[in-house]
Curated annotation (Swiss-Prot):
Phylogenetic lineage: Bacteria, Bacillati, Actinomycetota, Actinomycetes, Mycobacteriales
Function summary: This protein is located at the 30S-50S ribosomal subunit interface and may play a role in the structure and function of the aminoacyl-tRNA binding site.
Keywords attached to this entry: Ribonucleoprotein, Ribosomal protein
The gene coding this protein: rplS
Full protein name: Large ribosomal subunit protein bL19
Claim: Ribosomal protein is one of the keywords in the record: yes
UniProt superkingdom: Bacteria
Signal peptide span: none
SUPFAM superfamilies, per the entry: Translation proteins SH3-like domain
Pfam families in the cross-refs: Ribosomal_L19 (PF01245)
Length: 113
């Protein structure tokens, strides 16, 4: 075992479901406003997963009022309350950057059967 793996192991989360690029997910993020804390849901398509171990991140893209919004989250972040997989997508790429250029029905991802 690597020294860094030994240090990182206590911070790794085991409650994260398996998801891949192309999947539509709900990310429940803890938002702190002053003294209050609330959950905010960010629903979108996973366009990439990157890195490994404690440094692993994923990027979720959604359309909000006609504007594309992307947000990158660390997988093992304590600010993520939980993640729900809504649908499984059927894609042939690991990085779905081409979705940035597509609009409307063309940006739709087929669902896995």
């Amino acid at each position: 075992m690597n020294r860094l793996d030994f240090v990182d192991k206590p911070s790794l989360r085991d409650d994260i479901p398996a998801f891949n690029p192309g999947d539509t997910i709900n990310v429940h993020v803890k938002v702190i406003e002053g003294a209050k804390e609330r959950l905010q849901v960010f629903k979108g398509v996973v366009i990439r997963r990157q890195g490994g171990g404690i440094r692993e991140t994923f990027t979720v893209r959604k359309e909000s009022y006609g504007v594309g919004v992307e947000r990158t989250f660390p997988v093992h972040s304590p600010n993520i309350d939980h993640i729900e997989v809504v649908t499984r997508g059927d894609v042939r790429r690991a990085k779905l950057y081409y979705l940035r250029e597509l609009r409307g029905k063309k940006a739709k991802i087929k669902e896995k059967r």
